[in-house]
Regions:
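Conserved active-site helix of classical SDR/Rossmann-fold NAD(P)-dependent CH-OH oxidoreductases
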Residues: 9-17, 69-70
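Glycine/proline-rich active-site loop of Rossmann-fold NAD(P)-dependent oxidoreductases
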Residues: 9, 22-24, 34-47, 74-85, ...
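Residue-level signal for the nucleotide or nucleotide-sugar donor/cofactor binding architecture
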Residues: 63, 93, 137, 153
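Conserved C-terminal active-site "lid" loop/helix of NAD(P)H-dependent oxidoreductases
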Residues: 96, 100, 120-149
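Mid/C-terminal beta-alpha module of Rossmann-like enzyme folds, strongest
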Residues: 69-127
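Amphipathic terminal alpha-helices
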Residues: 153-167
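Short, small-residue-biased leader/transition segments that mark boundaries at the very start
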Residues: 3-4
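NAD(P)-dependent short-chain dehydrogenase/reductase
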Residues: 16-60, 65
């Protein structure tokens, strides 16, 4: 986990160095968990692969792919070289809540809640690292500086739209 964090920080530093050395304007985007068509809790629930893992107090921020696009376009119309932006929706939530909402939309019984300690026994180290920290991120800067108005401000709004689109 620390190695991944360090590599991300190093990558950001490299991009900012490129800007300094060559005058190439750079924006850095730190993306929350990405979902959208073909990659979402509805699909997982329908395929029977969704899991409701409970780790008390654990939440994750997410972002719909369409809102990522909106943010990137906004950054081009409001350039501020060297800025770092967190790109996420307005509501971090436990993954078990996201799965439960997807199942509700589909009319399926949600899978049983599995305590993290139990689920971790069968997880890869990478999967376990995902649960190591809360992933609550604030998006104030994209709204304030770039004027982004999220189409999907919550995972519920995003899943509802995906469901309505036949996902």
């Amino acid at each position: 986990r620390r190695v991944l964090f360090r590599s991300r920080v190093a990558a950001e530093r490299d991009w900012l160095d490129l800007q300094q050395r060559h005058g190439v304007p750079v924006h850095i985007f730190r993306l929350a968990g990405i979902y959208g068509p073909g990659r979402n809790a509805l699909r997982d629930a329908r395929e029977g692969t969704a899991r409701r893992i409970r780790k008390p107090g654990q939440v994750f921020s997410r972002i719909h792919v369409d809102d990522i696009t909106e943010t990137l376009v906004a950054s081009m119309t409001h350039p501020d070289a060297g800025r770092i932006y967190n790109v996420c929706d307005n509501e971090a939530a436990p993954s078990e809540d996201v799965v439960a909402h997807a199942c509700q939309l589909l009319g399926l019984a949600p899978p049983p809640v599995v305590p993290f300690e139990e689920a971790a026994k069968a997880m890869s180290e990478m999967a376990k690292s995902f649960y190591a920290d809360n992933k609550r991120v604030r998006n104030d800067r994209i709204k304030r500086e770039l004027g982004v108005a999220l189409r999907f401000p919550t995972y519920r709004a995003g899943l509802d739209a995906l469901f309505a689109a036949g996902e």
